[in-house]
Amino acid sequence: LNTVLHILFVIMSVVFIYPILLTLAISFTDEATLANYGYSIWPQKWSLDGYRFALSGNGIVNAYKVTIAASVCGTLLSVFIMLLYAYPLSRKDFKHRTGFTFYAYFTTLFSGGLVPWYIVCTKMLHLNNTFWALFVPSLVGSFNILILRTFIKGTIPFEIIESAKIDGSSEFGIFFKMIIPLSKAGIATIGLFQLLGYWNDYYLPMMLITNKNLFNLQYYLQSIFLDMEALTSGQYGSAAMASAVNIPKETT
């Protein structure tokens, strides 16, 4: 049985790893060779033109800096805020926990809509073209709050909290000295969800950012592809078409 499971996991690993290796191989393949012979896991002719084009200028470096900063700040803030909300919901002695739980759950069923969301972000919070726009609108997720609440309720006995209160610990003392250290597994899980979400986010910069210095990595790469599409489609005239001939469109 173990042998069968090992073989199954090896096959699944190959299935998941192969597209990554193929993408990496394509990035090192010469553009003309790719057009003539198609995709291959081993390049017939190696080339770094795609990397040279992507790294030309400081745009990609700045996009990495913005993405890393937004991902780290957003993850730390969102996990802390959601933990502050989730912890009271797990307490038996918090009489309003049912109402606050329903309030969090209700937002998963109905959305306020795109237009009200945009008005709040731009007219009330003034987030447009600011660094905060890359993570503040996504700081709190109701689903993550419910996960944290369930984790705390299921892993930390309420008797421990009562013992700490009897010993004279304050609510913030219990939260920082007991709840956070004992919830590391749940925090790590939600933190990973948030980190991946911020790193791969394309929606927020598309809606709120027009300043190229604030483009994150995903939106910057998309802007590169759109520029290449525009050049190769001839939208900018014959001079631009001439300069677009050598653009490594497929390998970038």
Segments and roles (model prediction):
Residues 1-252:
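A hydrophobic, multi-pass inner-membrane permease signature
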